[in-house]
Structures are given as structure tokens and as C-alpha cells.
Amino acid sequence: MKKILAIAPYPYLPYFSGGQKFIAQFLEHLADETELTVIGVETNDPSTVSNYRLLPWLKKTFTRYMDLRLIGRISREVKTGGHEALICEHPYLAWLCWLVSKKTGIPWYLHTHNIEYQRFRSMGKWWWPILQFYERWAFRKANKLFFITPEDRAFAVKNWNIPDTKCMDLPFGVTIPGYPSDKAVKKQEVSTRHGIAPDETLILFNGLLSYKPNLDALMAILEKINPLIMASSDFRYRIIVCGKGLPDNLNALQEYKEQHIIYAGFVEDIESYFTAADLFLNPVQSGGGIKTKMVEAIAYGATVIATETGATGILREVCGEKLITVPDNDWTSFAKAVTDQRESLFVTPHSYYEYYYWKNLARRIASRL
């Protein structure tokens, strides 16, 4: 097996956000194909790791992004451990990986989760031009790059003159190898848990609600989309909202209880909710990159209704009838798409799992390292 060293720049164990989950699951499945060591933040929970070595060398404070002592420490680990390649999650520690590569001679790979400067620009951060300059530098210095979306890869090639030969696709993966056989059972379980009638369409929204793009999407559901759905008097449904970080001023969505809204908070078995759901809503308007929760929802058999921005990054040709997109900010069309779908009879195509199943992804990446 190839010996690989990876650096994960922020806490990801246990995971709560899509970004954390992406790192955790990618490294877990990569470790099945390689002999993997990961350098992470000291606040990670090592008890959740079973198949790779986790070194808690990164400080929990922001100073970890400028800790020059890591250059020598990681270089020594590369030499004594016999590592053949270095993977950098996100561009934030690209400077460190570049210097370690120069000292040791091993290639380094940049695993991008978004075009980061675009994400922060869409969120109104003043310092996005600084990140843009640094991120472009990192792309050019890396030996190879993994891209989460075809759009990000095309942007790098066209706008930053990155050779396409340096680029590889690495989408957010799913742990389920095929269409679930227990959708009816899971729907009954979740419906019973929340007092939902058997003839009501179960609609799901999920995400880390302290993240502004997700919170904005939730407010669009509450204030724009749901009132339009309610106007369709013959449509029986409930919308379950899952996710931690809901602002206190929304009072656990108590004022929306009579408007078909259920707030479930953070749920440990989110896969059960994905499997139970008839529809999944993704009215995201900003944030960049792929919406990982949407990838999982389709894998577990839900039909996704998404804005064009929300559908960014997903490989649409493998989704079949399970992805419905509407223009951004067209909430009338969004609500109509929901009521038109109701309980979808379509199943997720086999080609979807061929592309997004984690084991397939890890094997493809390991063969290229």
C-alpha cells in the first residue's frame, strides 16, 4: 500500500457540518486503500478513528495557520515515516505543504472543497481579494489538485491557467452503494416520531444553521416558499428542519408549528431522515461549492428541489428524475415544483452510485496518488 500523509486544518471529528463530514469520510475511505497518517487539530476526537493514524499536531487556536515549527516537524515525519505523498485539505495550509514538499521532495496534492475566495465574497467578507491571490498561488504550486465540482475545475483551468492534466475530480461521496430498500419503513418510523400522518408528504431541510447560506435558505423556506405551498389547499405535507445552530431568536421555530413546520434540531441518525423523506428542499442562494446534503438526499432516494445556485456542482446527468431545479429567487416556481412532485415514484439511477459511492471514489483517487 502507498504511504500517504494528509493535513486537515480544522476540527472534523466528530463532524457536524458538510465540510467536516467530507474530510472525515474521504480520509476514512482513503485509509482503506492506503496506509494513511493524518495531522489534525488537537481537539479532534481520536476515538472515532479506526483505520488510520491521527497526529494532534495543530493548535486549536488560529495560530496554527502560521506555526513555522510545523515545517521541520512534518518534514521529519515524512522522512522517518516513508510517506510518498502529502495531501492538503483546503488551501489554508498550502504554504506549509509547499515548503515540506521542497524540503523532502515528495509531491503534494491540494484537495479543494470550493473556490474559497468566491464563497467568502458571496458572504460579504472584505478580505476575499487577499484569499483570492493566495488561493491562486496555491493552485499553481500544487503538484495536483482534487476538485469537488466540475465547475470549480473548469474555473481553475480557464481563469487561473491551471493545466487540466493537474486536475482530478473528487466529489463529495455517499456511503450507500445503491437505492435503499427500506424507504417505506424509515418513513413510517420518522413520521411516527414526529406525529406525521401516513398520507402526508414528508419534506426535509437539513444543514448547519449557524452557517449563513443555510440560515438564509431556511428563512426562504419559512417566509417565501412555505406560504405559497400552504396556498395549495389539497396538498398534505410536513417540513422537517434538521440541524444545529439555529439562532435563539427563532425560538426553535415554535411560531411556525401551525404552518406545517417541525424543528427536529441536530439528529444523530440523519440518514434515517434522508431515507424517510419524499422531497428535500435546497433553496440555497450563496456559499459556493456543492451542497453535500443534496448529494446524500438523492442517494437515499429523496427527490431534491433546488435553486440553480443550490444545484451547483452536482453531476446532473447521473441524477435522472431525482433533481428538479428552478431559477434563483423564483419562489413561485419553487413552491409549484414541490406541490407538483408530491411523492416521487422515480428511483435514483445506478449510475449515480457508480459516480458518488465513496469506495469507488477512494479507489480512483488512490490509483492516481
Residue spans for each PLM region:
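Acidic donor-binding loop of glycosyltransferase active sites
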Residues: N143, T275-G289, A302
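Carbohydrate-associated surface elements
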Residues: E151, G173
